[in-house]
């Protein structure tokens, strides 16, 4: 059985991942000064818990998407929603949101599944 990562270890992994994502986006020629739609992904298998987490995110001032069903590679179904933030591609600002959302996700026993965005010209 894998040992669960501490919050500090988890955030260190997300920091490294964030640096890699931002670097890859900029290397692909995206505009470093553009405003990006950052999508943070949260999920679990219990709709009621997911809904409560989405409401908590909304109350903290975040925009949230409607919940969706997602089928995983093994055929199991999870429920997810995104927290969306329009911002520059600023690693520190992204990490601030990641830290807040990871802590919130842990408080509801749901998963923070990382973030993504789309290239901007």
Curated annotation (Swiss-Prot):
One of its GO terms (molecular function) is endoribonuclease inhibitor activity. Gene3D superfamilies: RraB-like (3.30.70.970). GO terms for cellular component: cytoplasm. InterPro entries: RraB, RraB-like_sf, RraB_dom. It is found in: Cytoplasm. The keyword Protein biosynthesis does not apply. It holds the Pfam family RraB. The keyword Cytoplasm applies. Interacts with the C-terminal region of Rne. This is Regulator of ribonuclease activity B. The gene is rraB.
């Amino acid at each position: 059985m894998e040992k669960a990562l501490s919050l500090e270890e988890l955030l260190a992994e997300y920091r490294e991942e964030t640096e890699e994502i931002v670097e890859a986006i900029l290397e692909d020629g995206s505009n470093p000064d553009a405003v990006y739609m950052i999508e943070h992904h949260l999920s679990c298998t219990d709709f009621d818990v997911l809904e409560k987490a989405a409401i908590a995110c909304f109350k903290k001032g975040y925009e949230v998407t409607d919940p969706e069903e997602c089928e995983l590679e093994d055929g199991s179904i999870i429920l997810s929603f995104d927290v969306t933030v329009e911002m520059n591609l600023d690693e520190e600002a992204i990490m601030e949101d990641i830290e807040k959302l990871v802590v919130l996700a842990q408080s509801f026993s749901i998963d923070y599944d990382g973030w993504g965005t789309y290239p901007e010209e």
